[in-house]
């Protein structure tokens, strides 16, 4: 399955929530009618079946993290093998992706931009170049921008945007040095309450 290259706001409208696919300079509500899916007019929304709700939740989270279907299913399988709550394991695996950690630290304005920084070898993990967006970051790993990439205007712009929002408690960032530490795995209470991971588990458990 190819990666989606169409309008980002259309995906957020489809899922009925902000997927944080844009930089966040303006509230998404000011850019489009987030409550109305593309092609749906008026206040009435079609009623979804249980399967429909499960599918929509899976699509929402998959698109939020920018993960393809096969990758997402593999994350579910791995989360089911791990000890503990499968849903929480799934979210922790997604949060531990290098492209997501780069985004959480504010080096990329979006996850897509952060993924591009990783792919273009602009990111160091513990002093070594890693260009695999899905690389699994561990607690205490140091993430930094390469010296020759620090002058990129988009990174400076992303840090300015990040300065307007609260830094997640599971990362520490030195914006001046353009480096940070993934201090710990996020707990479920740290993450968005708008995600209902149980619906995803029910979908894949069938």
Curated annotation (Swiss-Prot):
Gene encoding the protein: rpsD1
Coiled-coil boundaries: none
Complex and partners: Part of the 30S ribosomal subunit. Contacts protein S5. The interaction surface between S4 and S5 is involved in control of translational fidelity.
Gene Ontology cellular-component terms listed: small ribosomal subunit
Domain of life: Bacteria
Name of the protein this chain belongs to: Small ribosomal subunit protein uS4A
GO biological process terms on file: ribosomal small subunit biogenesis; translation
Pfam families referenced in this protein's UniProt entry, alphabetically: Ribosomal_S4, S4
SUPFAM superfamilies, per the entry: Alpha-L RNA-binding motif
InterPro entries for this protein: Ribosomal_uS4, Ribosomal_uS4_bac-type, Ribosomal_uS4_CS, Ribosomal_uS4_N, S4_RNA-bd, S4_RNA-bd_sf
Role, per record: One of the primary rRNA binding proteins, it binds directly to 16S rRNA where it nucleates assembly of the body of the 30S subunit.
Any GO MF annotation of the entry: rRNA binding
Family from the record: Belongs to the universal ribosomal protein uS4 family.
